[in-house]
Swiss-Prot record:
The keyword Transmembrane appears for this protein: yes
Membrane-topology annotation of the record: Multi-pass membrane protein
Ranges that cross the membrane: 10-30, 51-71, 80-100
Protein family: Belongs to the TrbC family.
InterPro entries per record: TrbC/VirB2
Gene that this polypeptide is encoded by: trbC
Phylogenetic lineage: Bacteria, Pseudomonadati, Pseudomonadota, Alphaproteobacteria, Hyphomicrobiales
Keyword annotations from UniProtKB, A to Z: Cell membrane, Conjugation, Membrane, Plasmid, Transmembrane, Transmembrane helix
A GO cellular component annotation in the UniProt record: plasma membrane
Pfam families per the UniProt record, alphabetical: TrbC (PF04956)
The protein's name: Conjugal transfer protein TrbC
Subcellular location: Cell membrane
Amino acid sequence: MSLKTHHTPIFTALALVALGSLDGALASSGGGSLPWESPLQQIQQSITGPVAGFIALAAVAIAGAMLIFGGELNDFARRLCYVALVGGVLLGATQIVALFGATGASIGELHSQVDPFGYSPSPKLIERGEGAHG
């Protein structure tokens, strides 16, 4: 038996142990957020914030005034006004929805119900709509 074949199982076992011990170290090195999340969150806050409301209001007012008082507009200018009008409405859509009091989607509410015998609480889904009454 040569020295090369004698040490191969030992090196294989050591390599497997080393790879198994690296798994936790490699998994725990992540910061939890991806590098593009921060710029996307800033863009989202800019689009849905108060600045977007003012931009949407100005775009709707200017495009509407151009369509009403613009007189004879060529096809390109009219389409540009329509694009500005639709963009203003889309940017102001969150403010329009918030105007009616809607804050977000709520499909079902989970409430915790405590058992009278002192067992741990279990979540209970409150059903609403047609299927709620049987």
